């Protein structure tokens, strides 16, 4: 099986994940993560609705009205980093080392959000 690391879609996912990781969106801050995703989704024809619940922005991206409905759900905020000196790489740099993306939110949940948006 060949490597897919150089496919345009892979590059888009990684680039968006890095851009999201580089935004310091510590709870409850969004740091414009949703704006970044909404801009991409709007260019793809999605209708973006923003809703505030207390102090938290939530975005709904819809495309079409036909059934069945399908939903991706996630969050852009991350927990505090703790002592950043204990990190192998700065938590908000989005460093790729040995093919692994490092940073706060890479696994929960900014990497997954990037994959959802690009898909």
Please identify what each model-predicted range represents.
Residues 2-106:
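Acidic/His- and Gly-rich active-site-bordering loop/insert found
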Residues 105-119:
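Active-site alpha-helical elements of protease catalytic centers
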């Amino acid at each position: 099986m060949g490597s897919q690391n150089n496919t345009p879609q892979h590059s888009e996912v990684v680039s968006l994940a890095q851009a999201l990781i580089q935004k310091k969106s510590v709870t409850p801050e969004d740091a414009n993560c949703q704006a970044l995703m909404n801009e991409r989704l709007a260019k793809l024809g999605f209708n973006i609705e923003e809703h505030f619940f207390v102090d938290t922005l939530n975005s709904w991206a819809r495309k079409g009205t036909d059934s069945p409905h399908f939903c991706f759900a996630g969050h852009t905020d991350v927990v505090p980093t703790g002592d950043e000196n204990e990190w192998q790489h700065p938590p908000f740099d989005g460093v790729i080392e040995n093919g692994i993306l490092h940073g706060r939110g890479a696994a929960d949940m900014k990497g997954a959000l990037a994959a959802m948006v690009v898909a």
